[in-house]
Regions:
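Short, cationic motifs built from Arg/Lys/His that form the positively charged side of catalytic pockets
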Residues: 8-9, 241
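N-terminal export signals
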Residues: 2-4, 10-29
């Protein structure tokens, strides 16, 4: 039996009525049908024909930073506090005057992402609470007119660019603060105003900050793609940012899928988003952090299956990243400094099965074996020659012939034997050469695929399962 936790983003409850926000009913009146060549809902010629080119850098990057930061960070009880706790909007919006990140917060985030080996950053420019972190002209509920009196998105963009990182904007379509957000499903005029407001905010984000690489929609409730005018929304996005990639959370397929709190390969580009503890936004009392080994295993599993890993930080109210998160990311970064070739630019399909203590990635004809539990000291070695000498890493069902093998951390050459059933890497030390995961690179005679199921038809040749 498997259990998948309910995602907060997929479990959306009814939002309460909103306080006034300065909407702009005509904000999108000038938008035209930029590309009428729609082939079916959400798919039009430009997006389809350019997808592979636009995705190329992202698929090579494999690892990104997600940042949840907003008014909820002040409360310190995760990002859904406003709705989960039923905080009245007139009270909640008072938090805006108290959001005052330190001057260098964005540079700290970007430098941390760089040290962690992450290649792109995605910031919550507006979460469900409706507060805009940029200098928008469409509502006074923003960071330029309240609280910090600064354009935090501008600071984020400048910091990311200074570190050579790609830039992503998260944008929540759902809005608990806007007065039309709660009634747009049933009130046609409210819907027109709210959709125009949404288009206007997106237009600002994609016009005022130079080249943007990713648009990360979230929660299209309560409207359908038709009610959002999502086809036209995406066409506007590509008109403003021709090289951008968009996800699948405005009701359309977009360019990539976004499994949350799980690793689930799709038959297309995909990215798994995950937290280090139990929440996305800052939670003061949550110290249940995953280990670097678990998170690196998640990263390698994503790469093994051809996907990306978007790992979240939840900064404190002043923008400081919690020390536990800094430590985890720096550990991951040190590992990637040595083992990055086994992650960046790898292709999916290295394995259609999982090892007892290892994962697999591949690049060309190279198989990377990620050993997260070092298999030394098994007592079975005293009875089974298979496990001698002391440490053996064994891979069953490899389709390719191995030509050479080496430990990435040390460059040490690894001895091996191979037959139809398994590859045995021998002469390895008692202690793992690297922490928290040791990677062994095997040069093969063809693109390698590990498939343990290939072994079953071969067992009878070894006298297994045959009548005695």
């Amino acid at each position: 039996m498997t259990f998948e936790p309910i995602s907060r983003r997929s479990f959306v409850k009814f939002a309460g009525a909103g306080a006034l926000a300065t909407a702009a009913p005509g904000a999108f009146a000038q938008e035209t049908d930029a590309n009428p060549s729609v082939t079916k809902r959400g798919k039009f010629a430009y997006q389809e024909e350019t997808r592979a080119r636009r995705l190329a850098w992202w698929e090579a990057a494999r690892f990104g930073m997600f940042i949840h930061y907003g008014l909820y960070s002040i409360i310190g009880q995760q990002e859904w506090a406003m709705e989960s706790e039923g905080i009245p909007i007139p009270q909640y919006q008072l938090l805006a005057e108290h959001l005052k990140p330190k001057p260098d917060f964005a540079r700290e985030w970007a430098r941390l992402a760089k040290r962690a080996g992450q290649k792109y950053m995605v910031l919550t420019t507006k979460h469900h609470e409706g507060f805009c972190l940029w200098d928008t002209k469409l509502t006074n509920y923003n960071a330029m007119q309240q609280g910090p009196k600064r354009d935090l998105v501008r600071e984020f963009v400048d910091a990311a660019r200074a570190e050579g990182l790609r830039i992503g904007f998260y944008y929540s379509l759902m809005d608990w603060h806007h007065p039309d957000g709660a009634i747009c499903k049933t009130d046609l005029e409210a819907r027109k105003r709210f959709v125009a407001y949404t288009f206007g905010l997106l237009r600002e984000l994609l016009t005022n900050y130079g080249k943007i690489d990713i648009l990360w929609y979230d929660v299209d409730w309560p409207l359908t793609p038709e009610e959002w005018d999502a086809d036209r929304m995406n066409r506007m996005v590509f008109e403003l940012q021709p090289d951008i990639i968009v996800n699948n959370r405005n009701g359309l397929d977009g360019d990539f899928s976004t499994p949350e709190h799980k690793i689930k390969a799709a038959h297309r580009a995909w990215e798994s988003c995950e937290t280090m503890n139990l929440g996305w936004g800052y939670q003061r009392a949550d110290h249940e952090f995953k280990s670097p080994r678990i998170l690196l295993n998640d990263l390698t599993t994503c790469a093994q299956q051809g996907g990306n890993f978007l790992l979240n930080i939840g900064p404190e109210p002043d923008g400081t990243v919690p020390p536990e998160e800094v430590s985890i990311l720096e550990t991951m970064g040190r590992w990637l400094d040595t083992n990055g070739e086994a992650i960046y630019g790898t292709q999916g399909g290295a394995s259609i099965s999982f090892g007892n203590y290892d994962n697999f990635t591949r690049k060309g004809n190279t198989l990377y074996i990620h050993v997260y539990f070092w298999p030394s000291g098994t007592p079975a070695a005293q009875w089974l020659k298979f496990f001698r000498p002391p440490t053996v890493v064994a891979v069953g069902g490899l389709n390719a012939k191995v030509l050479s093998a080496r430990v990435l951390k040390t460059g040490q050459r690894v001895e091996f034997t191979q037959d139809e059933i398994s590859l045995r890497l021998t002469g390895l030390p008692e202690q793992a050469p690297d922490e928290p995961i040791t990677v062994i690179a095997c040069e093969c005679d063809r693109p390698p695929v590990v498939n343990h199921h290939r072994i079953r038809p071969l067992w009878p040749r070894y006298g297994v399962g045959m009548p005695g």
